[in-house]
């Protein structure tokens, strides 16, 4: 049997596709393209959080005006549209873990958790329940057949590359998902929106974390976890106490501005000692990292990760969403997975992701990745930090 444009067997008119519609231009264009190609399209929008503060806020997502925009687009395209209340699930799977992660001294990525649980688990099951053959989204990433399964690849428009946030997508999910925008540049997507007469053609892209009004994540975390605003010491990596802070929630590893102490030297946040409510600062050199240890690894390579050679596997790694993939070596032994960064990186924060690729081109395959559990700095800085943490543990035990 021949395959249609979504690599599914059969004619497009016999293929039902659920489109995850956020109310933005990207997912709206996906619905429009698939409808134009003759697919049986069903739009689904998730209400993920209390939209009171976001009803009229530009750059929000999945609340208030966005839901109305998705409804209007669906109506104009002549497709059924459903709004599902996932607010409780979103709080449980995304917002609470986000706050817990910050309290523990990490810098989490809620978009990964949202994709991993709410969008690509719960919504995917909803799509199956609706009898859909696939779930399509407006993410900028590509997938194509790889043997009996499908594999992920970076998009044509690398400025919009969302693969960093999709590393945790499982093989089962990848096989069911479709990403029609992966081969299109953003400018062309907006042109298509104009051609289709979509009311969201000029709508601003979503910004920051969707459930955080004005990007002030510290307000939400402090409300959910008041202990995150507990004051504590600002300590130099060499052991000197330099001042006080108003809660580790206001800091992240690599931060330079707004630290709250003036010593005449450039200082950066090197580590967040959540157990002792301390912000550890130091010179830029103390941020240099060549090795990161991963947890919750989602490996999408063809060879099982446990079967990697002792010499490791040459890959390219991204430790920030805004950075291009850089040369690295992936290793796995004794149940641990780590990545050695050939050129090093600065300011790597626990809780962030390390995503792995075959190369650094826009055709690179995504091999998955993991969350950064810890990193190793340059030997001198690593020893100073270990000594500082050990002394704190002794003081706490005394």
Swiss-Prot record:
Matches recorded under Pfam families: tRNA_Me_trans, tRNA_Me_trans_C, tRNA_Me_trans_M
Enzyme Commission number, as recorded: 2.8.1.13
InterPro entries: MnmA-like, MnmA-like_C, MnmA-like_central, MnmA-like_central_sf, Rossmann-like_a/b/a_fold
Positions of the UniProt region annotated as Interaction with tRNA: 160-162
Principal cellular location given in the protein's record: cytoplasm
Catalytic activity: S-sulfanyl-L-cysteinyl-[protein] + uridine(34) in tRNA + AH2 + ATP = 2-thiouridine(34) in tRNA + L-cysteinyl-[protein] + A + AMP + diphosphate + H(+)
Keyword presence, Oxidoreductase: no
Positions of the record's site feature: Interaction with tRNA: 139, 352
The keyword Nucleotide-binding is annotated on this UniProt entry: yes
GO biological process: tRNA wobble position uridine thiolation
Residues annotated as the enzyme's active site: 114 (nucleophile), 210 (cysteine persulfide intermediate)
PANTHER family hit by this protein: MITOCHONDRIAL TRNA-SPECIFIC 2-THIOURIDYLASE 1, TRNA 5-METHYLAMINOMETHYL-2-THIOURIDYLATE -METHYLTRANSFERASE
Listed GO MF terms: ATP binding; tRNA binding; tRNA-uridine 2-sulfurtransferase activity
Signal peptide positions on this chain: none
Protein species of origin: Brucella canis (strain ATCC 23365 / NCTC 10854 / RM-666)
GO CC, any one term: cytoplasm
Gene: mnmA
Family in the record: Belongs to the MnmA/TRMU family.
Protein name: tRNA-specific 2-thiouridylase MnmA
HAMAP family named in the record: tRNA_thiouridyl_MnmA (MF_00144)
Keywords linked to the UniProt accession: ATP-binding, Cytoplasm, Disulfide bond, Nucleotide-binding, RNA-binding, Transferase, tRNA processing, tRNA-binding
